[in-house]
Amino acid sequence: MRKFWRTAVAAAAVLTVATAAQAGDPDACKSVRLSDIGWTDITSTTAMTATLLKGLGYAPKIDQLSEEVTYTSMKKGDTDVFLGDWEPSMTSVRKPYVDEGSVVVLPDANLPQGAKYTLAVPQYTWDKGLKDFADIAKFKDSLQGKIYGIEPGNDGNGLILGLIKDNKDGLKDFQLVESSEQGMLAQVDRATRRNDDIVFLGWAPHPMNVKYKMQYLTGGDDSFGPDFGAAKVYTNERKDWASQCPNAAKLIANMKFSVDMENTWMDKILNGGEDPAKVATDWLKANPGALDTFLAGVTTVDGQPGEDAVKKSLGI
């Protein structure tokens, strides 16, 4: 009986090892295509994810796409993963694709708390009395009738255009200035150097909250949402990708971030001029304990221990 028991235990151990070795993903899953819409927070989280994928033997490919193109690309099967679904502001953009089933939203936010997204002003403009959306029109002359947004097609820009179109708070004669995140911040730099009034899209996490003395406007609940556009950021995947590539999908589901993490990464990218991939690598080397969470239940693409492989790729 004892001999039988030892044999059974040994067989179970062999089966466990064999099962682990057989994990991983099919060869077709080796290429993982991610969208980066050009916001520094999404650039940083996408770079972190790609660094881990690479360490696991995958071949991540990051494409610079707009929001709309991201969703049409997922629908066509050309993009697998998008880490930048800011909610509730992006609901109208993603909704048609989610409703038809071509895009899947992971149930748990990758940034569950601390995010916000609404209009903001420099502290000195706020001190003059521009504290609410309803105050913007009163400052039309000093604002030169302009509100500064980011890239064309962005959801925040769309909300501003809606305010202008509907003459919400008397904004019908205002102009939305569209450019990019960096372009908008250049305008904020210029205005703050001169103490000129300016209204712009602000959000957290982002180094702008440290670099500038700024305030978020009240009164935007109907457009940007309550609590100064309080937001959560979700991960989206193309239909069936998780079932086709379950190991890579497990990593993606594990990718959860904090405001402090993202602020650190973005500061190095925006203010330090560092490459996002280098920022990710350096941070992981300095914080190897994060691998326990990111890589829980994840193997390499060919089924070997995931954490060992990533540590080797990082040189730790």
Regions found by a protein language model. Name each.
Residues 49-56, 140-174, 285:
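Ligand-binding cleft/hinge of the Venus flytrap
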Residues 1-23:
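Gram-negative bacterial Sec-dependent N-terminal signal peptides
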Residues 22-33, 54, 137-144, 294, ...:
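Immediate post-signal peptide segment of exported/extracytoplasmic ligand-binding proteins
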Residues 72, 79-84, 152-221:
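Ligand-binding pocket segment of bilobal, Venus flytrap-like solute-binding proteins
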Residues 30, 40-41, 162-193, 199, ...:
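An extracytoplasmic/periplasmic, membrane-proximal ligand-sensing/linker region
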Residues 26-41, 58-63, 144-148, 252:
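Short, well-ordered beta-strand elements
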Residues 116-127, 230-244, 267-268:
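A bilobed periplasmic-binding-protein/Venus flytrap-type ligand-binding module shared by bacterial periplasmic
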Residues 102-152:
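A conserved helix-loop-strand patch within extracytoplasmic ligand-binding domains
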